[in-house]
Amino acid sequence: MSDYKFTLNLPETEFPMRGNLANREPEMLERWTKDGLYQQIRDSRIGRTPFILHDGPPYANGSIHIGHSVNKILKDIIVKSKTMSGFDAPYVPGWDCHGLPIELKVEQKVGKPGQKISAAEFREECRKYAAEQVDGQRADFIRLGVLGDWQKPYLTMDFATEANIVRSLSKVIENGHLHKGVKPVHWCTDCGSALAEAEVEYEDKTSPAIDVAFTATDSKALAAQFGVSDYSHPVAMVIWTTTPWTLPANRALSISPELDYSLVEFVKDGATHAVILADVLVEACMTRYGAESHNVLGKVKGAALELVRFKHPFLAFDVPAILGDHVTTDAGTGVVHTAPGHGQDDFVVGQKYGLEVANPVGDNGVYKPDTEFFAGQHVFKANDNVVALLKEKGALLHHVAYRHSYPHCWRHKTPIIFRATPQWFISMDNQNLRKQALSEIEQTQWIPDWGQSRIEKMVENRPDWCISRQRTWGVPITLFVHRETEELHPDSVSLMARVANRIEQEGIQAWWDLDAAELLGEEAEQYRKVTDTLDVWYDSGSTFASVVGARPEFHGHGVDLYLEGSDQHRGWFMSSLMISTAMTGKAPYKQVLTHGFTVDGKGRKMSKSIGNVIAPQQVTNKLGADILRLWVAATDYSGEMTVSDEILNRSADAYRRIRNTARFLLANLNGFDPAKDLVAVEDMVALDRWAVRRAAALQQEIIEAYEQYNFHIVTQKLMQFCSVELGSFYLDIIKDRQYTAKQEGHARRSCQSALFHIAEAMVRWIAPILSFTADEVWQLLPGQRDAYVFTQEWYQDLQSITLDTDLSDAYWDNLLTVRNEVNKVIEQARRDKRIGGSLEAEVTLFADAALTEQLTHIGDELRFVLLTSEAKVLPLADATSDAVETELASLKLVVNATTAEKCERCWHHREEVGTIEAHPTLCHRCVTNIEGDGEVRLFA
């Protein structure tokens, strides 16, 4: 054989079987950076239709986690696939840089502002800390193979962006959406600040649940309303609450106008009590109170009790019964304790009745000095003292520890309170913002589509947006208010424009350094500067204007797509929608795509305490970024995304299948120069034409899946193509032709041309997902080409050919089915030790007329399709008794061991081996391929 080995076309490539991604990817990244790859892509798309995916900024604090990786990889897949589709798709990553978490980190290092360090110095420290965090996260994102303008990202703390945030607010004010009010807001006593809705988490908490009696100021008159005359006992209305600490701020009792309320007399411990309760809750309440007996004396509708007065249980004033739509009978008594300073519903109903918005609680959660009974006590510690006082006053009917879901601060994990404070709000209804936003939601495409109803419900029910915070590190609310009237300066909009220009030069510190007289002149004495900062959700929510609307690479084009985790319906999607609609009357996006959260193999959240955290840095260091990218692409992101070591190892297995296919293609393109060796599609061997046609059809399906953001379908189709159509069929069949045909002959060049077309297409299909591997393949493909696959478009030379009417896709599908049946019988013969490999087999196919016509169409080349040394087709009626039935009624098979000699070069067993004098160990075909013009193949 040694003489003939050198006549074979053995596969050869520098593309290694093992990816060694963890080591090789960083080398590729260095080259991408050195070559200015991102700018090359931008230059290649000048003048093309823009596609703008706007990056929702992660917070500049801490290392990236697997959720960040999912998000950035999904964005990168979209940007790269849109670029392949010919769009100019810039990607400018961003970071959210202001706000409390950074302040807390800096406080740990340098202390609180105004103590050891000035506020100005504190802001500078915050800026430095945020910049360090950005650097760390940026390196991790780049390592994932995400291409973008990493050297010029947008930061909400960039002077220009800070200035644009102020300009955005001035537009909101100009359009009449801002108002100042005293309102109850989520308040964290640890932060000492208001919280946005998105900063609130619900956790279980144990609270005192109490039933409290408010005695009527005129019990006899009230009993008469229930049809009971001359009643001698005190009559009380009973509330149920889990926040006893709010009772000092009680200003009313809310009841439902539609509900029936009963006057109930009950006896407990020998004492008679008369109480008013919702009729449907009477039995439950009597059981709860341990009543020995009870009697309903009368019923009235809630509406009849409006404005009846009741004494506060421990303060020297009385409060009215008022009507509210928020009253339910899910629990409690059907009467709601109403403290307008401590609850949103309470506030709304209180406004209707002109109730005082009392707030006896300070920033730190401690009662103010003038609070009777409880001054200086922390509200949660005061709960027990309130209960004790109620007991002492005879107003406590029941008290129990109650476990319930309660709002907590997402940073401190501590319970929060509702607390009325003077704040700045964007009104949802003054200028019809709610109505406009709901209309814009309908004009937006939500992926998955349930996102639409989710955000609609949130917009329908959300209160006015409190945009002010009492913090140091944030974009200032650059307003002047009158010292006496608290009214905004009449020239606020133009003043803000001037302040924004200063901030653009000097950053937000310019506002705190500003002497009001510089802008207001003599008026300065009448006005004071607002010292509040903006909610950081305003910072990020205005980036469609402050970044996309301002940077030149976006060409003033609106945003096509926002893509974030499903928690952002109430976060970034919401804040962006509110600001954009308030500024322009339009949504800031055309499409909004959400992905689920990552969970472990058992469906649990990632948690350090459970020990199930999978860090992206560990995955890239061990398996490589392409494995992580393949897992992201292959997972249906519309639900929870399950990840574990086992799942990532399965991704690595799938990756190896794709890599091995790419390696086979490259190895068999050895010595192929498309400029001179490419065979026109119409001149190819029929099977090669089929392979190119299949690739063309698959490309259409893959492009469509990319366009619909169905990346798991891309990976499914790719795996199917590599494993079945290529791996188990086409590549298997062509090995013989590739290795043994004449090197320059048509049979081999036809096959190489098909492999070249498939490789050119496939490297583009995988580029958005397996970016490192695609680059590696691209560098080794034959022929003249640009430096990077990422500047290319989908492969245009995949012609969908229809020349083969008789050898259609259906024809080859049938042949594949027949081949699978033959393989089963050959496999059985191998197990029975009747043959070794399939080339030791002679197969006889007994087929009906229709199948016979198909099988004989390709003549002697049928044996190459079946990978046997001989294949004969005979009528089904002639089937011998030893013929094996198959799953096809039209086919029976007999497999026998060949008696012919084995060709030393191609390993086929042929009768002529040993009869050719010059080459006694070869078959005719091999002799032709060595010495003659090369074999002729038409079909396979």
From Swiss-Prot:
Binding-site residues for ATP, renumbered to this chain: 608
Chemical reaction(s) catalysed: tRNA(Ile) + L-isoleucine + ATP = L-isoleucyl-tRNA(Ile) + AMP + diphosphate
List the InterPro entries hit by this protein, alphabetically. Answer: aa-tRNA-synth_I_CS, aa-tRNA-synth_Ia, Anticodon_Ile_BEm, Ile-tRNA-ligase, Ile-tRNA-ligase_type1, Ile-tRNA_ligase, M/V/L/I-tRNA-synth_anticd-bd, Rossmann-like_a/b/a_fold
Name the GO cellular-component terms.
cytosol
Motif stretch ('HIGH' region):
58-68
- Function of the protein: Catalyzes the attachment of isoleucine to tRNA(Ile). As IleRS can inadvertently accommodate and process structurally similar amino acids such as valine, to avoid such errors it has two additional distinct tRNA(Ile)-dependent editing activities. One activity is designated as 'pretransfer' editing and involves the hydrolysis of activated Val-AMP. The other activity is designated 'posttransfer' editing and involves deacylation of mischarged Val-tRNA(Ile).
From the Swiss-Prot or TrEMBL record, give the protein name: Isoleucine--tRNA ligase
**Which species does the entry assign this protein to?**
Shewanella sp. (strain MR-7)
Ranked from the top, the taxonomy reads: Bacteria, Pseudomonadati, Pseudomonadota, Gammaproteobacteria, Alteromonadales
Q: Which gene encodes it?
A: ileS
